[in-house]
Amino acid sequence: MSKPVPDLMTNRLKLSTFKETDIPSIVSLANNYEVAKNLGRMPFPYLVKDAEFFLDKIVTTELTWKISLLDTSEMIGTIGLRPIVKDEVSELGFWYGQEFWGNGYATEAANAVIDLAFKELALLKIEAGHFLVNEASGHVLKKVGFTQTGTSLRDCMAQNKKLSHAELELKSINFVSPPAHSK
């Protein structure tokens, strides 16, 4: 995805471009086994070199946003779209610091990114997934309109093993923009 990352605003969140100065916040939020054990591509422990890799290799090749609280500018997580089929299909991924779980932030940010993906980027489909043990992410994905298409085994770096993984999709023809105040 070579398009610039546009800032997105919701009622409570600002989604924006990462900067080098975000490295300490990234490490602080990501260096938590409870976070890393639910993600395929996140190592644990999560060190400064991992945040540098994230900024240099992931943020530069994927459409990735830093998620911050609108009222305090505190970083709470990240969300992004990884291209699968150029200009047609991307994969949605997100993670949040543990202290920010359960507040509806994931749903709020996902709705904003999905809306942009279908309306501005003209994607036809977005895929996503979650480890079956991570029911909270599954709930978020279903809440924003994804439907399960199957299961697979996927690597989990932090756990150093393969885990059962739900595969989901959302097609643009099935997407309904949420009200601006949804969470």
Q: Predicted segments — roles?
A:
Residues 48, 57-58, 122, 179:
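Prokaryotic Sec-type signal peptides and long signal-anchor helices
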Residues 6, 42, 63-65:
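Flexible, nucleotide-binding loop/lid elements of kinase catalytic cores
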Residues 1-33, 68-183:
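Acyl-donor (CoA/ACP) binding surface of acyl/acetyltransferases
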Residues 34-55:
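Conserved GNAT-fold acetyl-CoA-binding loop/helix
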Residues 55-66:
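A short helix-loop-beta-strand connector motif used in the catalytic cores of GNAT acetyltransferases and
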